[in-house]
Every structure is written in C-alpha cells, then in structure tokens.
C-alpha cells in the first residue's frame, strides 16, 4: 500500500501541538495494530517549544516560556507558523535501523530544499539538513529531525524552516548546538516560501523513497479519516 498523507492544518488554521500529539499517538496505535497503513501527517503548528529526551533543564527558554517534553530523540527545538512539520508514522523493517531511517529523511529533505535553490547538505555528527558556512555566517540548520520508535513504528519526525520567524530560536540553544545558526528557505532565497508551497514537493519525495523509509503493508480494514481531537480535549500531559 502506498504511503498515505494527511494534511492536518496550515495557516491560517494552525494546529495546536498537544492536540496533534494526541493524534500522532492514535495513528501510531492504529499503524501498530494494522488497522491503518503507513501515514505521514503534515502540519503547521501554533508557536511551541518541545524538548526531546536529552534536554536538560538549564537549556529551557530563558524567559520561562512553556515547554512540552516529548519522547523523541534530540534536545530542545521550536515549532511555529511558517514551518512545515512532518510526522511519518510508519513500520520499520526488521532488524530496526533508526539511524538509516533518519539518514533517508535527511536525503528527502535535502532534495526538496535544493529544488528551491538552497544548497543544503548534511554535517557529520549532526542530524538534519544544513546550509554550510559562507560569507553570510556559520553553518545554519534549515531542518531538524527527531524521531521515536515504539513497537517497530515511528513517531515525531522533521521540521523544515520555510518562512517562519527565526527569533524564537534566540531564546534557546536549538538542538543543543552552540556553534551554529538557524535559517529558512525564505531567508536563504530572499523570497517568501511558505509551507503550503513546499508540502506537495515533500510528499512526492517521501513517496519516491517509501521503500527506503518503511515496510509497505495493507491495513486489515479501511481506516477512517484522520481527525484532530475537539479543541480543549487534548490529553497530552506536560510530561508526555
């Protein structure tokens, strides 16, 4: 079965992070159970900081802004308007190779970013997609990746800076990296490039790499459409 994409919400209808986290968990349970095929949620979030498992308290925002602790790898990062966030919830092959999964995501993102005229690449020892140091400044991260694997299926995923305000990153040490900066497609090209301009191309590239990302399978029964929980009903606690 082909990789299935669900566009959950884009500006002006931004998606609350906790509500989307509940949705991720629901879809993850269904993929594990075999009642839903491999699915990628595409979304643009309200402003939020999230902390991966390796985040330490002293790395939290200096102004006391709320942080949502989550189970992905990595450290502290920011999501907000103008950022394309993708959550691949897919079954991995056995034996599990999470590093390989992350490498394929990097390759997908880099291919998409280059299509928009930005020479992204990888940096040894650091995950995500990067623009290397030049006359404009040091190495700059344009996309972050952080995943979690449970019962052979993935959660969380990637965030690509498209047209988002980069100033919220100034309140934290993004991903725990002190000697590099952050950037976006819009900042690098000088043209406004929104998530809605990128999402179709991202879906195409993910589909082209499906065999490298996951094990295709047919769900036991046709799955219901993915829906966010009703506003105000999110159950994800701060320690999620």
Curated annotation (Swiss-Prot):
It comes from the Bacteria. One of its GO terms (biological process) is protein modification process. It is found in: Cytoplasm. The active site is at residue 175. Substrate binds at residues 72-79, 144-146, 157-159. Keywords: Acyltransferase, Cytoplasm, Transferase. One of its GO terms (molecular function) is lipoyl(octanoyl) transferase activity. GO terms for cellular component: cytoplasm. Pfam families: LplA-B_cat. Residues 229-240 have a biased composition (Low complexity). CDD domains: LipB (cd16444). It catalyses: octanoyl-[ACP] + L-lysyl-[protein] = N(6)-octanoyl-L-lysyl-[protein] + holo-[ACP] + H(+). SUPFAM superfamilies: Class II aaRS and biotin synthetases (SSF55681). Residues 217-240 are annotated as: Disordered. InterPro entries: aa-tRNA-synth_II/BPL/LPL, BPL_LPL_catalytic, Octanoyltransferase. The keyword Transferase applies. Residues 34-214 form the BPL/LPL catalytic domain. The keyword Acyltransferase applies. In the reaction, the free carboxyl group of octanoic acid is attached via an amide linkage to the epsilon-amino group of a specific lysine residue of lipoyl domains of lipoate-dependent enzymes. PANTHER family: LIPOYLTRANSFERASE 2, MITOCHONDRIAL-RELATED, OCTANOYLTRANSFERASE. Catalyzes the transfer of endogenously produced octanoic acid from octanoyl-acyl-carrier-protein onto the lipoyl domains of lipoate-dependent enzymes. Lipoyl-ACP can also act as a substrate although octanoyl-ACP is likely to be the physiological substrate. Belongs to the LipB family. This is Octanoyltransferase. It comes from Kocuria rhizophila (strain ATCC 9341 / DSM 348 / NBRC 103217 / DC2201). The gene is lipB.
């Amino acid at each position: 079965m082909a990789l299935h994409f669900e566009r959950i919400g884009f500006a002006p209808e931004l998606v609350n992070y906790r509500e989307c986290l509940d949705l991720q968990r629901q879809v993850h349970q269904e993929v594990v159970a075999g009642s839903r095929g491999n699915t990628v949620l595409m979304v643009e979030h309200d402003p939020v900081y999230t902390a991966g498992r390796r985040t330490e308290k002293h790395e939290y925002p200096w102004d006391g802004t709320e942080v949502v602790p989550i189970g992905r790898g990595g450290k502290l990062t920011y999501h907000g308007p103008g950022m394309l966030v993708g959550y691949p919830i897919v079954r991995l092959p056995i034996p599990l190779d999470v590093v390989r999964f992350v490498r394929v995501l990097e390759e997908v993102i880099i291919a998409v970013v280059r299509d928009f005229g930005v020479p992204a690449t990888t940096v040894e020892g650091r995950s995500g997609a990067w623009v290397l140091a030049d006359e404009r400044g040091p190495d700059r991260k344009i996309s972050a990746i952080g995943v979690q694997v449970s019962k052979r299926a993935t959660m969380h995923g990637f965030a690509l800076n498209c047209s988002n305000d980069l100033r919220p990153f100034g309140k934290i040490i993004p991903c725990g990296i002190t000697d590099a900066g952050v950037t976006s497609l819009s900042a690098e090209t000088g043209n406004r490039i929104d998530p809605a301009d990128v999402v179709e191309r991202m879906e195409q590239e993910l589909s082209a790499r499906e065999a490298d990302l996951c094990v295709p399978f047919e769900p036991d029964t046709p799955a219901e459409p993915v829906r966010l929980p009703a506003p105000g009903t999110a159950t994800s606690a701060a320690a999620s």
